[in-house]
Amino acid sequence: MLNEIKAKTKERMLKTIQSFHDDMKGVRTGRANASLLDGIVVNIYGGHQKLNQVAGVSAIDNKTLSVKVWDATAIGEVKNAIINANLNLNPVVEGNTIRIVLPDLTQETREKLVKLLHQFSENARVAIRNIRRDVMEEIEEMKKNKEISEDDFHVAKKEIQNITDDNVKKVDDDLSIKEKDILHH
């Protein structure tokens, strides 16, 4: 029973970290990276499609992204979606391809991006601590109902805290790497 709870806790915290990584992907580091456009949704064919479902995105060099639109009639919608994503990008249409030259990051922009990263990391840490709280309540309830012994309760409590600490450290480490990437490129 406790092993099940630990496994479920690890899984929930891993999903939180994956969500944090997804949030971080959308933050520019100063180098062209196809994942920068991952969150863009295109209004097309009477619905909404993710950009990667209507075009291929690749980095040509450190400063340039290429968006190869598969359906030439959709090029305008794709360009508008990129503009409306508020990423401070200026897409240029060249046939079936949209070229995006990434502007250099100013120090002010870098600091804003780092602030945003800190917000994402704090949200992840709060989510991890909330998961810990839920699990702790669950094992306290089990102890109260005599489903587990006092010793098992204390062991489980310590293990859940260790899992929590490991995951918070992972968030902090990943934040530090991304922050250095933004500030030093």
UniProtKB/Swiss-Prot annotation:
The UniProt entry, under SUPFAM superfamilies, shows: Ribosome recycling factor, RRF (SSF55194)
**Cellular component GO terms, alphabetically?**
cytosol
Keywords in alphabetical order, please. Answer: Cytoplasm, Protein biosynthesis
What Gene Ontology biological process does one annotation of this record name?
cytoplasmic translational termination
What Pfam families does the record point to? RRF (PF01765)
Offer an example of a GO molecular function term for this protein: ribosomal large subunit binding
Q: Where in the cell is it found?
A: Cytoplasm
> What is the role of the protein in this entry?
Responsible for the release of ribosomes from messenger RNA at the termination of protein biosynthesis. May increase the efficiency of translation by recycling ribosomes from one round of translation to another.
- PANTHER family attached to this UniProt entry: MITOCHONDRIAL RIBOSOME RECYCLING FACTOR PSEUDO 1, RIBOSOME RECYCLING FACTOR
What family is it from? Belongs to the RRF family.
Could you identify this protein by its name? Ribosome-recycling factor
Originating organism:
Wolbachia pipientis subsp. Culex pipiens (strain wPip)
Q: What broad taxonomic lineage does this protein's source fall under?
A: Bacteria, Pseudomonadati, Pseudomonadota, Alphaproteobacteria, Rickettsiales
